[in-house]
Amino acid sequence: MDDLLGYLLLPATLLGITAIAAMGLQLILGGAGLLTLGHSAFFALGGYASAAWVIYVAVPAGLTQPQLLLASGLLIGMGTAALAATVVAWPCLRLRGDYLAAATLACGQIAETCANNLDSVGGASGFTQIPRLCGLPSVALCAVVVAAGLWRLYGTGLGQAVLCARDDELVAQCYGINPARARLAAFVIGSTVTGLAGALSAHAFEFISPTAAGFQRSVELLLAVVVGGMDSLLGSCLGATLLILLPELLRFVPGPAAVVLDWAVALGLPAGVAQVALAALQNSVFLFALVVLLLLRRQPGGLVALWPAQRRRASA
């Protein structure tokens, strides 16, 4: 039983962290309608800044309480991500569509390059020996707080301004809304939440590397939001769940598949076809992509469209 709990602890913690980062991106992508391909930069900034603060400042200054170290580290990580998002947003948010996506992608590549070349934070080998200050309970608590906070934000004047600016800038201006400021606020808040996820990741897994700022991480977060449903915070959490748990489940496919294909060969299936099928089923990336494509083909609105309340709302 202990082995099972230990096996589930890592993916559960990773799921919570990914859900937090995805909810931050949902505010930007689904709420403000801004396509960003470099969002992982803020995840990495939050993690690196928090770890550097704890190792190089807080501990040498005599701060030893784990709770205070974690709280201060999370605040530093979030603050760094917020500051970076503000600096990035002023030039980038003047762009639209593909140009904005390309600009944010460049920011992500810059962050990854800087992390690779800074020896003080481990360089290409990654930042190691980070104190483990949090685990699943802390991550779960932060995920609940973030979900409640963002849900409440959508009900405020700022949240409504963000949605109105996304839907129609002219109408937003008629209501006295400044679309640029609304988008800026959404971008900074969403990036700050993602910075929190990065800080939690660094202190939960005691490690962070430049790949945290890489394009693959940005695509994973984007995939979680799109697959789950861009218009819903719940969708982001469901997408993060699929993103983390599906690869774990697909690891158990090749064994039974090999037995079934052996039976099929005995019944007359050509051996070459069986070998190709087995090779495909042993490729977890291929299986994951296939499942995602089939899901989006069946449910373009994402996983959240399967939720009973969402289905009743759509049919009303």
Where are each of the predicted segments found?
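Transmembrane alpha-helices and adjacent helix-loop boundaries
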Residues: M1-A316
